């Protein structure tokens, strides 16, 4: 079938056109059809646009972009009981093999055969309608807009990172990187019980967006040394947690100086190349290192946090473009303006 979509043709070229895709818009027994209303432009979309690959995921043929989405249910399969036509929803973009070992053990994000929107060779959701498993489609709280619903996907990464970090009430956390994911991690850490989150970056404009947020201390790495700020704020003990959300190899330079004894490091960002790690310091200080990949089993909790008002993502939405201006939206996102956090596309 042919659909109208935002298509990555090749490195540096995006178009809005009709494209032939497999499948049908008629949902099977356990699926729903959704009219897409809002889609966020993710850093991974931009990376594919600029570089054509992320690690082993290589764009070899035209691919529809987009995986952060919210919309309205327009049809339901015969066995779907929890959703109905007209429901406002957001969609978890990774569809695992529901019978795989990883899925059955509760780690469906690690299923090697997961089909994740806009990850080659799987098409994304920047198209007017999609069909998706009902089990991975979630109702939006009444007070959560489509724009906020399209932010659930990146926020879920933050919530999952906070969960894996085993936050204790009163913890002090460092978050390296004030991009979309870093800010989501910071908000989730505070909502999970951290007394203070120290957010560092080289982009002052991004730090300024959250400088007045209760519990957040910002560190401009162009002007201050992170280790000095952490030492001053923790009486020299160091941070309980360090969330690496920048993907920058420089974040590892003084990581072990920043984390306190018995602390935890949660790796969220993905460096392009291998990075050195001070293993001796890690052992002497008994620092635990935890890696995370996307998320699992946190979408309902993420929506509950949004609906409760404990986390407000609206200030992070920098601009919205109509679907027919999608190419312009990607061109802006690719510029990586220091004051932009999230660009969205609306239908």
Each model region followed by its residue ranges:
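Glycine-rich beta-strand-centered segment in the early N-terminal region that forms part
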Residues: 24-39, 54-101, 141-143
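NAD(P)H dinucleotide-binding glycine-rich loop of Rossmann-like/cofactor-binding domains
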Residues: 95-176
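Conserved beta-strand positions in the Rossmann-like core of class I SAM-dependent methyltransferases
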Residues: 74, 197-198, 266, 290
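C-terminal hydrophobic helical "lid"/dimerization subdomain
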Residues: 1-5, 253-257, 296, 300-347
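Glycine-rich cofactor phosphate-binding loops and adjacent beta1-alpha1 units
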Residues: 165-167, 208, 212-288, 327
């Amino acid at each position: 079938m042919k659909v109208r979509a935002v298509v990555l043709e090749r490195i540096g070229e995006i178009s809005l056109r009709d494209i032939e895709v497999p499948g049908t818009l008629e949902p099977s027994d356990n699926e729903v059809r959704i009219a897409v209303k809002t889609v966020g432009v993710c850093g991974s979309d931009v990376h594919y646009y600029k570089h054509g690959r992320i690690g082993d995921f290589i764009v070899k043929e035209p691919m529809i972009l987009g995986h952060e989405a919210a919309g309205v249910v327009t049809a339901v399969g015969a066995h779907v009981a929890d959703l109905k036509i007209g429901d406002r929803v957001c969609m978890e973009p990774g569809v695992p093999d529901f019978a795989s070992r990883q899925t059955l053990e509760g780690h469906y994000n690690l299923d090697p055969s997961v089909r994740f929107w806009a990850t080659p060779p799987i098409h994304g959701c920047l198209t007017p309608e999609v069909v998706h498993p009902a089990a991975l489609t979630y109702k939006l709280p009444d007070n959560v807009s489509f724009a906020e619903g399209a932010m659930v996907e990146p926020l879920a990464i933050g919530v999952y990172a906070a969960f894996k970090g085993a936050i204790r009430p009163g913890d002090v956390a460092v978050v390296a990187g004030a991009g979309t994911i870093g800010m989501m991690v910071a908000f989730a850490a505070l909502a999970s019980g951290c007394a203070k989150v120290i957010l560092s970056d080289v982009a002052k404009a991004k730090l300024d967006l959250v400088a007045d947020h209760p519990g957040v201390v910002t560190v401009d790495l162009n002007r201050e040394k992170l280790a000095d700020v952490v030492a001053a704020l923790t009486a020299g003990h160091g941070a309980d947690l360090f969330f690496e959300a920048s993907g920058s190899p420089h974040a590892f330079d003084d990581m072990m100086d920043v984390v306190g004894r018995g602390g935890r490091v949660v790796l969220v960002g993905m460096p392009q190349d291998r990075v050195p790690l001070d293993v001796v310091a890690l052992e002497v200080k008994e620092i635990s290192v935890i890696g995370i990949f996307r998320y699992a089993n946190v979408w309902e909790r993420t929506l509950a946090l949004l609906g409760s008002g404990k986390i407000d993502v609206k200030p992070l939405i920098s601009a919205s473009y109509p679907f027919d201006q999608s190419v312009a939206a990607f061109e802006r996102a690719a510029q990586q303006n220091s004051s932009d956090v999230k660009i969205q596309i609306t239908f």
